């Protein structure tokens, strides 16, 4: 095979996982602060909006605003409308219970909170299939929750889909054994560590890896100060450096404003980094300049979703590679 053909082959081989064909998002019908998840999601806050209906209305407005910006950037967004049949206050965060992979493969995950398990709704896949998206293989890890083991999708794991590495910060919601099982099934190399943030002068585990770390093709945004073990920190830095990624550090105060909960999406127009307005406002000029070398920054206000749900823009998006 000629050199050009080899290069072209590898580009085509990687294209499915490099370029996002489309996105799944769940439009909420019952969004509110989830008491079940607040046990270990310490990013959730009680906000001044008192009425449940007002919280829902604000969250829908924020959701629709983000969708509009995604579409404007050229991304196909499949929107599944949640209903009131099930008590699913966190349905707006689908990336925790389902991930999509090349070769028409999906994975379904075990969830810590009982009311989040209701989000695994067959109707979501039926909706996507009605849009001519086909899925030939399902890896279902959900039964592990019956034994008290959890792995909440790309919340628990930050995937480097090009270099096939899964970065995973352990917590009540993230099992080391399940991470290893996923990595065996999908041929990823696990990089497992612990990360913390300071709450009332005490170091508490960060509930999801994607709050402290955002993986992009050419760079990684990460709060290295949240990793207390020097050996674990050095291992991550080496892994990122070996993959020739520029490391863009954020502080713990920026982490608290969801500066780690961003997502790079790439299409024919180029690389875009989507984030919340609060995350963007937390960045300094140097960080913005570093990101802008590689990606167009797009930010959207999701204050209600962040404060009530304890998650931000990255959590709202499930990338589809099909």
Language-model region placement:
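Positively charged N-terminal leader segments that act as targeting/secretion signals
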Residues: 1-7
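The feature marks the mature, well-folded catalytic cores of soluble enzymes
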Residues: 11-322
